[in-house]
Amino acid sequence: MLAMGDRNEFCSLDGNNSPKWSVFNALAWKLTPDWQWLHLDGGQAQLMGYKRAWITYNRSRILSAARSNLIPGDFLGCVILNEVGGDPPWIKRNLVMPARQYLFWTKPPMQTSEGAIKMQLQAALSVLGHSGKELSWKQQNELTACLETDAFNIDVVARFLRKMILFDYPNINTQTLTDEQFVIAGSRYNRGTARPLKDFIQSLKDLPGKSDRTYTEYGRAMLRHRAEVKALLGL
């Protein structure tokens, strides 16, 4: 077992991380009534409070990774707001990924999402320049440990987001996104690259209730929280 400060094949493990989303947090989110007048800090308030605190704690890292990868800080921050919290990380690491080593009818282990900013192992590996590489169980655990390190997690997500922008818009200034580009590139983080750009553009035009509108729901949520994320990042 690697300790913080050690190095594995993929990264140096840094112990300076935001507090993890715990079972207690998840139970307070799922089981405590969302009654603000009782000040229980449960329900959606528990989840959103954690998300905001995570971004605030890692503000300098988020802004630095965005600058290094020539993407807007609020774009990276909005993906983070969507991703952090939810299922405690040990569920994927200790239950889901081990089961996927043997249960052939489930998703492959490399499609397991790990890290506070949830990201599939295969996506992280592609950013590191090893697309399609098969990892041993030991290597999967090492990459998971890296994704559970905030600095690595933020950087690899920022690098992947730049790829998602350029996938549809190869000739643009990636530091300045229109609302459409913001929504579509953000939705690519969640939906991947299998679907053509025209489907996402049509999804943006679709009225509520149409099934294809779901293709851009992720990016729409990002756009709704954009002003709040900017404030958290001091932008």
Segment roles from a protein language model:
Residues 6-235:
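Catalytic glycan-binding domains that act on GlcNAc-containing polysaccharides
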